[in-house]
Amino acid sequence: MLTKKQLDLLEFIHKRVQRDGVPPSFDEMKEALDLRSKSGIHRLITALEERGFIRRLAHRARAIEIVKLPETLGGAARGGFTPRVIEGDKPDAPLPAGAQAVSSADAVALPLVGRIAAGLPIEAINQNSASVAVPGQMLSGKGDHYALEVKGDSMIDAGINDGDVVVIRETSVADNGDIVVALIEDHEATLKRYMRKGSSIALEAANPAYETRVFTEDKVKVQGKLVGLIRTY
């Protein structure tokens, strides 16, 4: 039987994965549960893992997959933290739980418009030279969609690795905690977690090696919101 804190954390992780496709950061978990330190989150995660509700994925910093949910949260897990679509050239290799295969029947071709920095600045997005197939159900919400190749490791704790392809829905607005494509001062594009703090906008990395960058709101334009991720094995 889970304690209230364990249940609250499991529900928070599940809702964030369902909404964003990626788990919350440890800081976000700490804030959501009103805990004073990350050590409390570590203890709760360990307890959930020991009870078989979650598992931490190897070689992915702090990446969490929900294995099951208690009946109070809807029973069986409806998808944990795994890439929403997997492509690869090893047909006999097992796919992670919850991964979706792309078939020609339901695939949609999106423009791969360039590279996005999950680390140091690289370039703004403006190179439409290729396309990538994604499942149609990934394209939710209003607005056009496009794909970007990730360069850098600043978002690894959110499960976004160097070389991944992210699927972005075009939008100019974002809620706190969204992972967005942000254009800084009209020339630098970056993939970061969006946090508005008064009249300032903080672009937070998901890697402790990178500092949070804070700008006045006139310096940052939201170009899109993360809705999916493609990883090649």
Swiss-Prot record:
Its EC number is 3.4.21.88. Residues 26-46 bind DNA. The active site is at S154, K192. GO terms for biological process: DNA repair; DNA replication; negative regulation of DNA-templated transcription; proteolysis; SOS response. It catalyses: Hydrolysis of Ala-|-Gly bond in repressor LexA. Keywords: Autocatalytic cleavage, DNA damage, DNA repair, DNA replication, DNA-binding, Hydrolase, Repressor, SOS response, Transcription, Transcription regulation. Pfam families: LexA_DNA_bind (PF01726), Peptidase_S24 (PF00717). The record marks A118, G119 as: Cleavage. The keyword Transcription applies. It is an enzyme of class 3 (hydrolase). GO terms for molecular function: DNA binding; serine-type endopeptidase activity. Homodimer. Represses a number of genes involved in the response to DNA damage (SOS response), including recA and lexA. In the presence of single-stranded DNA, RecA interacts with LexA causing an autocatalytic cleavage which disrupts the DNA-binding part of LexA, leading to derepression of the SOS regulon and eventually DNA repair. Belongs to the peptidase S24 family. HAMAP family: LexA (MF_00015). This is LexA repressor. The lineage of its organism: Bacteria, Pseudomonadati, Pseudomonadota, Alphaproteobacteria, Rhodobacterales. The gene is lexA.
